[in-house]
Amino acid sequence: MSSHVPAVTAPTPSTVSENSASKDSHSSPMPESKPVSVNRKKQKRREKAARLAAQRQAANGHAPSDTLDVNGSSSTVLDNDVSHEQSGGGYDDKSEKVLNGHGHNTQELPHPSEHDPQGTTSRKSKKKRGKKGRNGSQASSTPMSTPSISLSNAPRPPLSSHFGSQSSSKLLKERSIWNTSTQEERENIKTFWLELGEEERRQLVKVEKDAVLKKMKEQQKHSCSCTVCGRKRTAIEEELEVLYDAYYDELEQYANNTQGSFERGPAILPPPGLYQPPLRSPGQHTHTHGQFHPSRGRIHEPEDDEDLEEDYDEDEEDDEPYSDEEYEDDEGSAARADFFAFGNSLTVKVADDLLKNDGKHFIDMMEQLAERRMQREEDTQYGIAAAHQSLHSSHNHGPLDDEDYDDEEDEDYDSQEEEEYEEDEMDAMTEEQRMEEGRRMFQIFAARMFEQRVLTAYREKVAEQRQQKLIEELLEEENLNEQRNAKKAREAQKRKDKKRLAKLAKDEEKARREAQKAAEEAAAKAEQERKLEEQRKKKEEQRKKREAERKAQEEERARKEAEKHKRLREERERQEEAERRQREQKEQEKKRREEAKRKEREERELREQKAKQERERKAQDEQSRRERERVAQEQAKRAPNLQPVSPVSPPPESATPVVSKAPTPAKGRRPSQQGSHSSSPRSQSASAEASQVSPRSAPLSQSSGSSIPKYGSGHPILHPHPGAPMSPLGRTHPPGLSPSNPPGLSGLVPRPPMGHELPTYPPHSSPYMNQLRGFPAPNGIPVLPGMNGTRPMPPGRGFPLDAPGIPFHAQPPFSGIFSPQPSGLPHGHSRQPSNSFERSPLDTSAQPFPISRPSPIKRPPSTQQEQRNSRRDVDDLSAQLGSSALLDDSDVPLTSSQLSQSLPGTTPAPVMPGPARASFAGSSLFPDPLSVAKHANFPVSPVIGGSTWGAQMPFGAPFPGGPTWGYTPANNNAFGAGIHHRAHTSRPVAIRLLVIQACKQLSTMSPSKDSGGYHDVNAVLRQVEQLRPSNEPSISLKEMLDICDTEGNAQNGGGTFSIKSGQTGELVKFEPDAVSTTTGHRGSIVPGEIGSPIPSSTMPALGGIGLGTPPSSALRQFSSPTTGF
């Protein structure tokens, strides 16, 4: 307690005034209605207190009014119902309102006039005056020894260990230190005081005394420093020492007396100053007892005792929060009487009044006591009774502290009359009484002040306890929070563990399901693999089975192919055997023919030799005869007058033909037939007849015999002996052509004739002469009636106007000196010796014959029909054994019926026959498409030169295409340029060419990638039949397939044929090679295709005069590229 007591200091006046001012600002008068009854008043009072406390809590943010906060919160107002009477006083003080020392919950007692509107005017004035005095004293009143306690601003040091004893702390812990009522607080204060030790109590008293002395010194510091004032201060201090010593003695005595009773039971009497603990702040003492005025050291009674009595009665009724009823359960009536017996006097009120105005009244009272003591001492010394007043009045210094007094102080003493009244009353009292009254007043004052000190110490202890409790509660709350957080953490951990366990269980379940699913999938996969393996095995077995079947089919197919190849090979062998036999047969036939030819040649040579000898003999005879005639003529010239006897001359050479009376058309005899009788068995007897020509066939050129000069021995013999046939190769110029020398240069040696200058026909043999001789026109078309006499062409035209196939006689231009010398037309002759190009026995062109003696005139040919009929067998045999033996091995000999059909001029009507296998050298409108000219350099055919009897070149025909002196003959062929007849082609070659062309046309017309170039043999056969000439015999399928098996070469078109068996039958495909690509379109029959000849003509290939070209012939006039002989 010793460490605690020095901290309690008295506040400075400025601090006290500031606290009081702030507390006044928070306090407000509280009007109350007049209660109807005691119980209702108490109820209303409690309700009002609770309502005000709630409002203050809401406005200031403090704890409720019934609690005492350590940091300045409100505490419940302590109310002590004191009701004591003084015999001399005449009024009762029934209640006193004590407020909280902190000043937050300050509550003023309303003036009695507020509850009594029916009071008199004098009472109202007194109340107003008392209210003014109270308000004036509030401004500067501060209790001297009560310090301001604010735990929030200045922390208190802890109390001693005695304060925290086990019994006290245990008792306080059992009770609520936060919510304490007034009765509980009183009990706690009393317990606190009794628990204090002697030293602690003495220390509290000493602290209070020092605070009072300090306050008095502060109040007197502005006073003068004279001896009187010094003595006064010394007297005051001595008086205080005596008073506090006496007060402490009384406290010790009370404490010692009550200590035993406190320990024994609840009947405890309070100390003299503890009858009513003033729970109010130092600045709030003026709020309670402001209506009492100081008595200047004397106790006086107010003028109107009844008013005061009524005022206190009203105060008891209005401000009675703690009535006797509230303590009936706590204390007995005797204990309450002893407890409240200390303050049942008017002096308590006066002592409370002395505490007003910051202890100023108390200081004044102490000064008065000191002055009286000094006056008493002076009176004792000088014996002057009234020294005190004179001494006091003679002191002229100013007031002790003018600054501390307010203007309202004058209002506390309204008139001079009241002051005179108080002085008179004090003078009436004895000095002893005044001293006793002063001491008593000091004791009461000291008790009041000490109560405040004890209350302050108690509150400090309570504050520390509450602070400790708060700390404990905070710690406990913190512990609770920690425990709660730990519990939450544990719960969270439990939840996490639970979740983790659940998750683990879920994962295990998931893993189990996955494992089960994987096992199922593995089983399903194994089952699927097993099924796949079974399927693979099945497929493998099926594949092996199919492979075996395929192999079997391939073996069967290979066997069939082998059989087919074997059959084809056997068939080919048979065919080869047949061909070999045929070839052997042909060879044998050829040998026979050669033997026959050899025999014929020998016979012919023999005949020729005989004929030559005969001709030579005749020539010699003729020469000798002519020599004789010449000699005779010369002799006659030398002797003109002499008439020589000349021999008999032969008949004239220009014989006139004898026309029979009934001329009948007779078939012209072929030149080859005229000389072939000698080769027959009966040719010896008919040799003379063979040289004779019928009168109809006598040429006009015989008239040239009369132009032989009678003189001209120097001229060369132009004609050989008639008996010797002239060979075409031994002539000086080609037969039928004039000598190559120009006119007038006959003596020059002519150049040898070129191969292409050998014409076939005489240049001047006209169509009508040929008809007279029984030969058809060289072009194969007889001249129509009325056309045998033709007019000559004008000299300006260089070519004859002859339509194709209808030759007109064209007079050559230059018919003057450049005309060829006429020569005799040859008669029938014997066969010429064979050379490199033998003429076919079927050739219709007339052969040149040597000029012979004119034969005698005979009968017309119609008279010799029987003779010719009897010789037909000889002609047939001659055709078979003669020129037929010279045919190629592959050529098929034609019969006499075919020959008769193909020979032009054999029919009476002018028929235009189609081409046949054996084409003649005579010109035809429709040459054989399969033929090829063998004699490219020899104009065998009359169509080489264009017009048959065009103008002959005087100096020999130039090379083809070169300019000559003669005019260019017109082209008589249907398609322009002269087309050579091709050599005779065998049937297999022709069929193979047709098959090649058919395959190419089918590939062009219907190309198909899927077929691979293969075509159905039936379609190929149909195409071949379309391409086959109409006069050719039909081709069978077997013949075509057999020919397709032959190998290709340059003659049959080349390439190879592939034959395979398909679903629809056999298929054929042509595969060309280098030979087939170079030969080109050998068998092309369509003009305009690649390889076909370019049509050219000097005149339109239309019909001539009244004759057109047959439409079908246009597709037949072509030729393929030649392949040589």
Swiss-Prot record:
Key words, A-Z: Coiled coil, Cytoplasm, Stress response
Compositional bias of kind Polar residues: 11-20, 68-78, 138-153, 831-847
Comp. bias intervals (Acidic residues): 302-332, 401-430
Record region (Disordered): 1-185, 259-333, 378-435, 474-773, 792-916
Function: May act as a negative regulator of salt tolerance.
Similarity comment: Belongs to the NST1 family.
Domain of life: Eukaryota
Protein name: Stress response protein nst1
Biased composition (Basic residues): 39-48, 123-134
